[in-house]
Amino acid sequence: MSQKTLFTKSALAVAVAIISTQAWSAGFQLNEFSSSGLGRAYSGEGAIADDAGNVSRNPALITMFDRPTFSAGAVYIDPDVNISGTSPSRRTLDADNIAPTAWVPNVHFVAPINDQFGWGASITSNYGLATEFNDTYAGGSVGGTTDLETMNLNLSGAYRLNEAWSFGLGFDAVYARAKIERFAGDLGQLVAAQNPALAPVAGQILSDTKIAHLNGNQWGFGWNAGILYELDKNNRYALTYRSEVKIDFKGNYSSDLPIAINRFNLPIPTATGGATQSGYLTLNLPEMWEVSGYNRVAPQWAIHYSLAYTSWSQFQELKAKSTAGDTLFEKHEGFKDAYRIALGTTYYYDDNWTFRTGIAFDDSPVPAQNRSISIPDQDRFWLSAGTTYAFNKDASVDVGVSYMHGQSVKINEGPYQFESEGKAWLFGTNFNYAF
């Protein structure tokens, strides 16, 4: 396999990790920006203004706040993703708990300037992914470690035109850091079985040999906007938009395979003997639209709902280049647009207690033929519940919990065939304070 193909495999893994959005929503795009939202399956987020976290979804909601308001917390993700299968070498491909637990923090602040203007800021994570396999895993050439961490800094402002209409605009700065590692697994055995003449060479490739390592980091920038229409104090509707984010991702590649192996033209990544090479790829994270509604149908009851649409069809190909500008890889991906639908209800028990629940469905944007075990994406169903306790008119705490279940899917990757099924529990808490 050529050096071109070697970097291609690593670049592909990083690219898919970064652009596959919402770690525990379809496509692995993170939704977890607040704990109150978690408790209602993030339904109606563009139209609800019960804490500062909603402003990160719709900046027009800034006009709903009459005091500076702060919110901070985190969501704990406890996934259970398992892989099963058998390699052509007869070695098992079974692996349990390939996705580690994770914390997703969030911080939000909203401040009105006057009756018409206000501003807000937030720190969240909109993208994230982590899968880990043992170094000696038989499918290590497609498994290994895939780790993506992001931080989104948002600064926004809003303007109230009249009692009914408000408009908001925000700026996003996204920092992304990724690491990809791949190991030989049973590739040596497969090569020897296909061509016995190469058995002596293939036998030198141990299962835990690191055949690819890539890491890098970069900033990307985008914007978001929102419109809020208040029919009256009990009924409001929202339209929100988040732009593409272009990330010129820079990375370093290395392989621990000895360079001498290259002359045998084995079907493995090109060896660099541990030396590092540079490369880059440009990713355009897809835009997202969302329509939300909130209706207080009774003094103590409200319903809320959302329909989100992500333009994943904008991701039709993946192209990696060297620092010299040569095309290293170009592949048609053909992702499809995906949607998310959510419905929830809130019960305002008294001045201290609020209870909420919600359900949601996440449509996967990844076609079946493009699934991988490093990103075993699938459609997901949410079931959520949560509560808020207000200590007084200034301070409150949110608690939310969600259970997500993904359908069982088949994955064909390289010489391997897998089956994957995943579920996850999410627990969140936020503290809110109005000054």
From Swiss-Prot:
Compartments it resides in: Cell outer membrane
MF annotations from Gene Ontology: long-chain fatty acid transporting porin activity
Record-linked InterPro entries: OMPP1/FadL/TodX (IPR005017)
Cellular component GO terms held in the UniProt record: cell outer membrane
Membrane topology: Multi-pass membrane protein
Cross-referenced Pfam families: Toluene_X (PF03349)
Function: Involved in translocation of long-chain fatty acids across the outer membrane. FadL may form a specific channel.
PANTHER family hit by this protein: LONG-CHAIN FATTY ACID TRANSPORT PROTEIN, OUTER MEMBRANE PROTEIN NMB0088-RELATED
Stated family: Belongs to the OmpP1/FadL family.
Protein's name in the database: Long-chain fatty acid transport protein
Organism in which the protein naturally occurs: Salmonella typhi
